[in-house]
Amino acid sequence: MCHTSCSSGCQAACVPSSCQPSCSTSSPCHTSCFTSSLCQPTCSTSSTCQATCVPVSYRPAVCLPVTYKPTLCVTPSCQSSVFLPVSYRPAVYVAPSCQSSGCYQPSCPTLVYRPISCSTSSCF
């Protein structure tokens, strides 16, 4: 049910094809929470968001369980630790102190969702 499309030039750490959500063009999953436009899910007018296809740490916040859903997912507000655990936050909003302490490897792309297990050899 899931499909993917990474635009030309997309960063290597795009969500694997087996784990990207499908969504309709009217779905909030289309633009809400992927911070890199190159790695947004493909949309089809005949499909709906398949949140279960994507591990929680990679899902747009609109598809996350309520427990992990921030009110504003791609604004500077996400820098606040009250919204999401660091492993579920877009890397671009992870506090610099966390990045420097090893929560994220700096060699991995910074504008994609990724878990704290991200490493230099395998971002996903």
Swiss-Prot record:
User: What's in the keyword line of the UniProt record?
Assistant: Keratin, Repeat
Q: Where is this region: 20 X 5 AA approximate repeats?
A: 10-117
Q: Keyword Repeat, does the record have it?
A: yes
Query: This protein's superkingdom?
Result: Eukaryota
Under the heading Pfam families, the entry gives: Keratin_B2_2
Q: Could you tell me which InterPro entries the record lists for this protein?
A: KAP (IPR002494)
Q: Where are the sequence repeats?
A: 10-13, 14-18, 19-23, 24-28, 33-38, 39-43, 44-48, 49-52, 53-57, 58-62, 63-67, 68-72, 73-77, 78-82, 83-87, 88-92, 98-102, 103-107, 108-112, 113-117
Family to which the UniProt record says this protein belongs: Belongs to the KRTAP type 12 family.
> Function, please?
In the hair cortex, hair keratin intermediate filaments are embedded in an interfilamentous matrix, consisting of hair keratin-associated proteins (KRTAP), which are essential for the formation of a rigid and resistant hair shaft through their extensive disulfide bond cross-linking with abundant cysteine residues of hair keratins. The matrix proteins include the high-sulfur and high-glycine-tyrosine keratins.
Name of this chain's protein: Keratin-associated protein 12-2
Question: Which species does this protein come from?
Answer: Bos taurus
What broad taxonomic lineage does this protein's source fall under? Eukaryota, Metazoa, Chordata, Craniata, Vertebrata
